[in-house]
Amino acid sequence: MWIQQLLGLSSMPIRWPGRSLGSHLWILIAMLQLAVDFPSCDSLGPGPEFRLLSRPQRPQRLWSLRTGPPTRLPTPAWSPRAARAERAHGPIQMQTPRARRAHRPRDQVATLGPKGGLTKPPAATRSSPSLTSASASSSMTAGAAEHQSLLKRGRRHTHDAEFNDFDFHGGRPTTETEFIAWGPTGDEEALESNTFPGGFGPTTVSILQTRKTTMAATTTTTAASTATAMTLQTKGVTESLDPWKRTPVGVSTTEPSTSPSNNGKDIQPPRILGETSGLAVHQIITITVSLIMVIAALITTLVLKNCCAPSGHTRRNSHQRKMNQQEESCQNLTDFTPARVPSSVDIFTAYNETLQCSHECVRASVPVYADETLHSTGEYKSTFNGNRSSSADRHLIPVAFVSEKWFEISC
């Protein structure tokens, strides 16, 4: 369209002295315009992501014969989101209400008008044959340089928009478009400029308000979560333009934020998920096992002491009884007197019923002594029965004890 217009202007009669010079100048301008527009067409051509939202306006000339200085070219207004939505759902008019709500902030931003040197130039005036060819060539060179810089800037914005529009949820394309609001983790970074210079002013304000609301909710939930000793860092979580989607930013940070907190309160450093305050699990298990072992040792000691005390007392009593018997036997043996020992016949006849031993055993075990001074049988029996009334009878031998010992040894 504009090439035909340029060719039509070049075919118009020019009232310059030197018609051939003016014709060659118009041809040179048309060729330069084609050379400048080809890179922009190549950048927009291969990718179907970038399509023009509206009908392209009439291109502005590189220079004007009436105003003199070159005018700025308008940058093409493309939107990657519109292309994705059209490819996934068909025409733009067939989008769901959910997608239309997601596009609403972007559309509002677009209506505010871009900043940073991307504003539309004023309407160019018609050219008038009042300048010379020298001024035209200088203005054409300056306009070409500025147009190249604008094309580079637009191409950089295009790559940034393509990178920011990439879906990070699994690396697969989603049928529903999503706008990622990259937000800072601190208050001092809330007013930083976004990737598109001057294009997201209202978005920055909404992100800041969302962060204030999120931090206020975090302050109320932190008091309730102290009982479980598990805190989560929600300061770095920024909500997207959709209220049901959130993009966590800075959740994995383990260092406390050095930025001043709200109301002058210090924010506790974030903790790792699953970490509990106090003793670890293996420490609790070790302490429990140690206590159980100590209690078992005490119970075992008490049981053994109670069980062994009666048996030890009984053993001690029996040992004491044996010692007493040995002492008595030794004392009785010291009073041994051979003159008063009865004969073997008397011993056998006196103790035959109690010892139940044969005549040979008694004769072999008990030595035969002289039967000179023997007492009567009744007196001997009284001596055997142990009825020693006075100390005078201590010179008698305890015949029962001696005969019993010899009986045990021999029989």
Curated annotation (Swiss-Prot):
Listed under GO cellular component are: adherens junction; apical plasma membrane; basolateral plasma membrane; cell surface; cell-cell contact zone; cytoplasmic side of plasma membrane; plasma membrane
| Cytoplasmic side, ranges | 305-411
Q: Where is this region: Targeting signals?
A: 304-411
Q: What ranges does the record list as Low complexity composition bias?
A: 62-76, 121-145, 247-264
Sequence ranges on the Extracellular membrane side:
44-283
Write out the transmembrane intervals: 284-304
Keywords assigned by UniProt, alphabetized: Cell adhesion, Cell junction, Cell membrane, Membrane, Signal, Transmembrane, Transmembrane helix
Keyword presence, Methyltransferase: no
Name the predominant localization. Answer: membrane
Where is this gene product found? Basolateral cell membrane; Apical cell membrane; Cell junction, Adherens junction
Highest taxon of the lineage = Eukaryota
Is Transport a UniProt keyword of this protein?
Answer: no
Alphabetical list of Pfam families matching this protein:
AJAP1_PANP_C
Q: What does this protein do?
A: Plays a role in cell adhesion and cell migration.
Please give the name of this protein.
Adherens junction-associated protein 1
Q: Please give the organism.
A: Rattus norvegicus
